[in-house]
Amino acid sequence: MSADNSSLVPSFVVFQVGTRRVALPRDCVAELIASPILFSFPHTTPLITGVVLRRGRIVPVLDLGPGLLGAPSPQARFFLVVERRISNSSERCAIPVQGECELVAGILLPAAGEDDFVTGCLDLNEERIDVLDLEKAIAAGVRSEEQLISAAEALS
């Protein structure tokens, strides 16, 4: 019996948040949904831009823009539904994405940047794509959002 070598190479989902192309490991991505209705409501939770209904469930929408770009992401037509691992349980959330998403196989190279939420990078057709640690990227966004709120309060 021969081993299938393609299963040894990890897969990643490459997507775009604002102007930045990034990737997540394939195993934390559930699906890509197009044009769902985004329901907004008053709240104080950082990064949540609203919720979408998917398969009879309410899925919070988390914007990674503040952590990755320093500003909220532009409005999106597509949402990547991902599994967050929180303690011993998991929860689905949706991330607004711009442009195309693609599934790629590649070797995870060491991280070259300063961002603590980047676990490594992929070399995709001579383009360096950062691979994110989802929980650390969300935490970076929360910190960025809190800094923006503090700065706005200081100005008023």
Q: What are the roles of these predicted feature ranges?
A:
Residues 1-156:
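An acidic, low-aromatic, low-complexity terminal/linker signal
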